[in-house]
Amino acid sequence: TYFKIDPEKINASLINYKPSNNRSQVIKTNNNTVIVDCYNANPTSVMAALESFKLVAETNKLVILGDMLELGNISLKEHEKILNFIESNNINCITVGSEFNKVNSNFKNYKTVDLLIEYLKGNKVSSSFILLKGSRAIKLEELINSKSI
């Protein structure tokens, strides 16, 4: 045993580990299953999350994407690439933030998460498999805290 820790205890700890920091958390709400990955977002991490999400064998899927911040002069191009990928893969999507708002797309965009929460009060999302992915400052976790999804 390494560090004199029983391997069974290590195994039990790993099996019972549940992330709680908005990094790939899976949360079951009353209506949906939600992957909460809204601690950080950059083009590489968003594309990796989307590639994995599109492989999930669920029929009613929704991506809620928050802006990728701090991209400087490549921001518009990178946000466009993400939305082009989503559109070409026929993934349902809602975006949050002013960066995604600059992209010409057919997806619903809300400048703030509070505006999206207001929209969802009258437009419930049910029986869905949802990916929340965005930069921390967008505060997508408020969708869980407000019981909007």
Where are these regions (language model features)?
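ATP-dependent carboxylate-amine ligase
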Residues: 1-149
